[in-house]
């Protein structure tokens, strides 16, 4: 699967490690930046191109990172067709439900609140969980048609 990645400075080191993990899992990564550390960078500059790419290819997904992942998810969710779910720790069921009920196509991770090992585990759960459709598809259609 194609996985689009983006982060600001807060997730830069983790993004590069996630890329290696994705390769080990057999996925292709497309890196939308940041490519170098700049404490003054602005996350929308990287998140918008990533989210647009995911929106244009429904067979791909995205992983975005930031300090908390909140602003990044807000930016991604501005793009029609994107359903970004935020995770920065807590019950793993949150990740499962983001796929089962919400068909999340972007995972927004709070890099300052999770270890590398925790992030790998969450990514694998997210990849392994399918959308249930049914009554949930009706709700997704309403989001997409708004």
Question: Which positions does each model-derived feature cover?
Answer:
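A short beta-strand-loop structural module common to alpha/beta enzyme folds
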Residues: 28-40
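Mid-chain, well-packed structural core segment of small domains
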Residues: 65, 70-108
């Amino acid at each position: 699967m194609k996985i689009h990645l983006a982060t600001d400075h807060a997730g830069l080191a983790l993004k590069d490690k996630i890329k290696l993990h994705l390769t080990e899992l057999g996925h292709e990564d497309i890196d939308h930046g940041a490519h170098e550390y700049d404490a003054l960078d602005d996350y929308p500059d990287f998140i918008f191109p990533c989210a647009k790419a995911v929106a244009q290819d429904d067979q791909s997904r995205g992983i975005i990172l930031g300090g908390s992942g909140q602003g990044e998810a807000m930016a991604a969710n501005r793009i029609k067709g994107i359903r970004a779910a935020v995770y920065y720790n807590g019950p793993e069921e949150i990740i499962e439900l983001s796929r089962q009920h919400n068909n999340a196509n972007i995972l927004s991770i709070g890099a300052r609140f999770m270890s590398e090992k925790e992030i790998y585990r969450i990514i694998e759960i997210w990849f392994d969980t399918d959308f249930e459709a049914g009554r949930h598809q009706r709700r997704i259609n309403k989001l997409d048609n708004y």
